[in-house]
Regions:
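Short, flexible loop segments at the rims of nucleotide/cofactor-binding pockets, characterized by
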Residues: 85-90, 112, 142, 183-184
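Conserved phosphate-coupling serine/threonine residues in phosphotransfer and NTP-handling enzymes
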Residues: 14, 113-115
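Structured loop/turn residues at secondary-structure junctions
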Residues: 18-21, 112, 169, 189
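N-terminal helical cap/lid subdomain that shapes the substrate entry/recognition surface
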Residues: 1-96, 100-105, 121
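Asp-based, Mg2+/Mn2+-dependent phosphohydrolase catalytic module
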Residues: 1-5, 97-104, 117-222
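Charged, low-complexity surface patches
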Residues: 67, 91, 113, 166, ...
């Protein structure tokens, strides 16, 4: 097996503990939606960003200006919650050493995130000093699980998907890696246990990023 040229990480729950309550986020979006829609929308399994896009598109079918206002306010709600959570967030102790070790080994570390850079940098102000590519929400052409998010990062550093590993604490991250043609690893530092990744058949599942790096070293991948 050839050595990896790049490892791209998710941020929240993977490199940092950020207590963001996505269920409460969707409750807030639902309350806002009640102002613009005939009845209060009921949250489903759709992630908050995509759910807001879908709801606002429904409003736009009736009144474009109202739909745009709903979308704008909803995005502000999401960003405010991300920033609030970041104030209580903390970087995992292994994060900086792992990223710096990868660079020293000639493996390009990167981060792609559905979160905004302002929130990420509240937790990790010097993040770009430790990475070779960083694509937060506002810089992404399309967001994971769309593989374009990962492919955008890999293209920026000139690495082919087959020589890269995507790492995250959510099945969405493993799905992103698989769809992009990269290797994929799940870590259980978030809300998902090992069994939550099984249906996607990730290449690796580890208790945290530090444990994953040890496994990659034993496998000769880094």
């Amino acid at each position: 097996m050839r050595r990896l040229d790049a490892i791209i990480f998710d941020f929240d729950g993977t490199l940092a503990d950020v207590p963001l309550d996505f269920d409460f986020m969707k409750t807030k979006i639902a309350a806002l939606g009640e102002v613009f829609m005939d009845e209060r929308p009921v949250p489903d399994g759709t992630p908050a960003l995509e759910w807001l896009d879908r709801l606002s598109a429904q409003v736009m079918e009736r009144d474009r200006d109202e739909g745009m206002e709903f979308l704008s306010r909803g995005r502000l709600v999401i960003a405010a919650m991300e920033l609030d959570a970041a104030r209580d967030g903390c970087l995992y102790e292994f994060t900086r050493p792992v990223l710096d070790d990868l660079k020293a080994r000639g493996v390009a570390p990167g981060v792609i995130s559905r979160n905004i850079s302002a929130a990420i940098k509240k937790v990790f102000p010097d993040i770009e000093d430790h990475l070779q590519v960083f694509i937060p929400r506002e810089s992404a052409d399309r967001l994971k699980p769309d593989p374009a998010h990962l492919l955008q990062a890999l293209e920026r550093i000139g690495v082919k998907p087959g020589r890269a590993l995507m790492v995250g604490d959510h099945p969405m991250d493993v799905e992103t890696g698989k769809r992009a043609g990269a290797m994929a690893a799940g870590v259980t530092t978030g809300r998902i246990g090992a069994e939550g990744f099984a249906h996607l058949e990730p290449d690796f599942v580890a208790s945290d990023v530090a444990a994953l790096m040890s496994e990659l070293k034993r496998s000769g991948l880094i």
